[in-house]
Each structure stands twice: as structure tokens, then as C-alpha cells.
């Protein structure tokens, strides 16, 4: 792919999501900028405790392991490692078949044959995301869970969801590190520095920047105190319009992808509570892009133009894990209303 930055590392959670995929939420594991120099994992040893989740379709596996067991702590420390096969790079894929590739025949029948092909090192990298040290919350986050849909009224948000969120220790220091250029400054694709209506645009962890099919960037607003969709009012329209227009323009300039080939949306519930907007390739089924979580930014802007209190009053539907305490609280309120 032309005019793309080299693959770099970054830690956010993701989360995700969805992530819903390790999302930009995995950032909690560190704030250092990416580097092309040889690096080491931030721990020694890795003894697998449990496979938290795996997907043959997505070529990804989430592992819980014990590390640093040789440091004198007999119990070691917890870490989560996410291993993901990277997508093919179209401009390099022909190299897999030139010369004498290393092959192992699986079967042959008439015109059909299947092989295991062992690619050269530069075409066989595995994206590795590390969460270390990992807490019980991280282990639960990455473990496969059953989901349930729940409808949250405006009153539910004010009396249940918001107090619950405020009671949790949800650090977003990694977000401030990006905004303050303490981490990942070299990864910023575009910035509007206005403290009220500006933002930074940065590649999401789920995109390795080697092809456009799964393009994924995040716009993070400079203004602090806007937690989610629920906080938005007409006061924030200049910010939202800037993100939509300038974000699309920056992506067109850098990646030659036009606005009508982008899906631009917010999550609710978000994976972290500092306003951010997702930019993904329209043909990419990104985690969290389903109707129960994604809200198109253009529609959000129009809703606020029509009704200043739209997101304070509207009932919003989203999915929660069955073991999420917030689900129990909202279900109880729903039962009492019925």
C-alpha cells in the first residue's frame, strides 16, 4: 500500500472491543511509541493458564498466562497475550509463490490440490498484543461470554449507568498520553489542536496499516469531560462536524480513500469513556460495527440539530455480558417498570 506509515505498536483498550476486538482498549498495557529496533516482551517466560477465547474465522487467540515465575515470586504474575494472523499484503503476496516455496502436499485430486505453504519471515508475522500486568477485569474482558440486549432509558443512564461507571476505576491515562504527545506522537495522522473543537486522528490497534481493506482509525477529541454519546448536546456540534469533515479529508489525503467508502461512527456503550469516533473501511466488518452498538456520526449530528436533548432522553439499546453487574442493575429497573 502506498503512503502508509510502518506498522507500530500501541496499547489501549480496545477492547476490543469486539471488539470488539482487541481494540484500542488494549492500551492499558503500555504507552511507549512503536519502534523498528529489536524489542523484547515486558516479562520473562509465559506459562499458559487458559485459552480465554479463539476464533478460527478471525485467526485470533487470546491467552491467559503466568509470567516472571523465575523472579522469586512463586505465584508469578498474570498477563494476557493476543495472537492474530495479519492480513495478506496484496502487493507482496506474489512473493509467496515465486522461486521454490516450501510446500507440504495435503492432497491432490484431478485439477485440485491443497498444500501447507511455509512463507518467508517477512511475510509470516503475527500481530502480538500484550496486556501486562493483567487484572481480573482484563481476564473477564477477553473471555468469551454470553450477551444480552438491554434497553437503557435516559433516566436509567442518570440513575443507574452513570453512578455505576463513576464507582469503577476506569483509567484513561493512556488517552491523555496520546493527546499530550507523551506517547504515540509519531503515529498521529492528523491533528486539529483546538482545545475545545479539535482532535487527533490515529490508527487503531486492530489495523496493521499494510492494506486498506481493513482500514481503521480513531479520532480522539482534545476536550475532556465528554464521556459518551449521552453527554452530547448542540454545544458539541462544531467538534463533531470537524471530526467528520476533517477526518475524512485527512484519510483521503493520506490513504486515498474517499468519504463514501468510510463508516464513521461512535460506540454506545463505548469501550472507554473519553469521546472518540471510529473510521473504518466500509467493506470491513469491524468489531462493534453492528446496529446494537454503532451510531453513525452523520446521524448523531442530525439528531442533535433536530433535538438538543436527543441523547439525554432517548432510549438506547446495547449488549452486555451476562456477568456484567450493570446488566443486572438495568434488568432489575426494567422489571420494576413492568
From Swiss-Prot:
Region (Disordered): 1-36
Annotated substrate binding sites: 174, 184, 204, 206, 267-278
Domain of life: Eukaryota
Cross-referenced InterPro entries: DcpS/DCS2, Histidine_triad_CS, HIT-like_sf, Scavenger_mRNA_decap_enz_N
EC id: 3.6.1.59
Gene Ontology annotations for the cellular component aspect, listed alphabetically: cytoplasm; cytosol; mitochondrion; nucleoplasm; nucleus
Keyword Transmembrane helix: no
Subcellular localization, as worded in the UniProt entry: Cytoplasm; Nucleus
Entry GO MF terms: 5'-(N(7)-methyl 5'-triphosphoguanosine)-[mRNA] diphosphatase activity; identical protein binding; RNA 7-methylguanosine cap binding
Activity: how regulated: The hydrolytic product 7-methylguanosine diphosphate (m7GDP) efficiently inhibits the decapping scavenger activity and acts as a competitive inhibitor in vitro. Inhibited by 2,4-diaminoquinazoline.
Phosphoserine modification, residue list: 23, 100
Major localization listed first in the record, in broad terms: cytoplasm
Motif nuclear localization signal (NLS) mapped to chain: 9-12
Acetylation recorded as keyword: yes
Active site positions, chain numbering: 276
Function: Decapping scavenger enzyme that catalyzes the cleavage of a residual cap structure following the degradation of mRNAs by the 3'->5' exosome-mediated mRNA decay pathway. Hydrolyzes cap analog structures like 7-methylguanosine nucleoside triphosphate (m7GpppG) with up to 10 nucleotide substrates (small capped oligoribonucleotides) and specifically releases 5'-phosphorylated RNA fragments and 7-methylguanosine monophosphate (m7GMP). Cleaves cap analog structures like tri-methyl guanosine nucleoside triphosphate (m3(2,2,7)GpppG) with very poor efficiency.
Domain notes: The C-terminal histidine triad (HIT) motif and the N-terminal domain are required for the decapping activity. The N-terminus is necessary but not sufficient for binding cap structures.
Similarity comment text for this entry: Belongs to the HIT family.
Protein's recorded name: m7GpppX diphosphatase
Organism: Mus musculus
